[in-house]
Swiss-Prot record:
InterPro entries found in the cross-reference section: AceGlu_kinase-like_sf, AcgluKinase_fam, ArgB, Asp/Glu/Uridylate_kinase, Glu/AcGlu_kinase, NAGK-C
UniProt site (Transition state stabilizer): 26, 248
Function: Catalyzes the ATP-dependent phosphorylation of N-acetyl-L-glutamate.
EC number assigned by the record: 2.7.2.8
Name of the protein in its database record: Acetylglutamate kinase
Keywords associated with the record: Amino-acid biosynthesis, Arginine biosynthesis, ATP-binding, Cytoplasm, Kinase, Nucleotide-binding, Transferase
Naturally occurring in which organism (per UniProt): Methanocorpusculum labreanum (strain ATCC 43576 / DSM 4855 / Z)
Keyword Nucleotide-binding belongs to the record: yes
Family statement: Belongs to the acetylglutamate kinase family. ArgB subfamily.
Gene Ontology BP term (one): arginine biosynthetic process via ornithine
């Protein structure tokens, strides 16, 4: 059996296992500003769709938002890996997320032969959120009170809307925006939204595509390919996890604790990493499960 044949045969049991299962993929990192990388990811998502998986895409846009802010002479501010969002930043986020990136992904899906529907969390009551309260966070070695501004915590997901789109053969493309119960706009961390949507849809998999190869050790020399919830708690406690990896792991842990079978964090900048993670025995990134089992 040659290498091509062995790759296909290695994929077969996974394709069979994942058939008709729901997978939520969070697109983030450099792919948001590199159309070639984005198209490669979209090709993978369309392939998953055509082998029988129910695919939901949730996209970020952090690098693009930061570039737009810089062009307008505004500096981005982050605390604990979360963007501080004032009114002007919220307007920029809405323009970039729902206006530019969402439309670009839907167009790429169409060019690759599938049907995408671009929606944001504030369409059709898809996501109801509440403003994130002022809270104490560690900034360096100091504990400070932080107001993230127009940033929300997800409270409700209208899963029926997404199920209707999936049943009709569409790939939902979701921008991480939401409304509160009074109709006020809020920005939602894309990792958090993807995790909550995965829980609401009872998804089999949650995938986070980012700029790093997975969850790394403190020295950043080694990837943890398999982690349990207990492992993640230990890494969070000893300071191994920091910056933008914090919300990714928090979303992954929350999803797994609420029934998602496996959460994966991997580099989305290498061609077809998504397929290698899902359809090969060794994978390429980090998989988080409730216990050390193979999925």
């Amino acid at each position: 059996m040659n290498n091509r044949q062995s790759v296909l045969m290695e994929a077969l049991p996974y394709i069979r296992k994942f058939h008709k299962k729901t997978i939520v993929i969070k697109l983030g990192g450099h792919a948001m500003v590199d159309s070639a990388i984005m198209n490669s990811v979209v090709q993978d998502a369309v392939l998953l769709h055509y082998v029988g998986m129910r695919v939901v895409l949730v996209h970020g846009g952090g690098p693009e938002i930061t570039l737009k802010m810089k062009a307008l002479g505004k500096e981005a501010r982050f605390v604990g890996g979360l963007r501080v969002t004032d009114e002007e930043t919220l307007e920029i986020a809405q323009m970039v997320l729902a206006g530019k990136i969402g439309n670009m992904i839907v167009s790429m899906i169409a060019k690759n032969g599938a049907k995408g529907v671009g929606i944001s969390g504030n369409d059709g009551g898809l996501v109801i959120a509440e403003k994130t309260p002022i809270r104490k966070m560690m900034v360096g070695d100091e504990e400070v009170e932080v107001d993230l501004g127009f940033v929300g915590d997800v409270k409700e997901i209208n899963s029926n809307l997404l199920e209707t789109l999936l049943d009709a053969g569409y790939i939902p493309v979701i921008s991480p925006l939401a409304l509160d119960r009074k109709g006020n706009d809020l920005n939602i961390n894309a990792d958090t939204m993807a995790g909550e949507i995965a829980v609401a849809l009872k998804a089999f998999k949650l995938i986070s595509l980012t700029d790093v190869d997975g969850v790394m050790n403190k020295e950043r020399t080694e990837i943890f390919h398999r982690l349990t919830l207990k492992n993640v708690d230990a890494l969070m406690s000893d300071g191994t996890i920091s910056g933008g990896m914090i919300p990714k792991l928090e979303a992954s842990v929350n999803a797994v604790r609420h029934g998602v079978e496996g959460a994966h964090i991997l580099n989305g900048n290498s061609e077809h990493n998504l397929l290698l993670e899902l359809f090969t025995n060794d994978g390429v990134g980090t998989m988080i499960t409730a216990s050390m089992i193979s999925l």
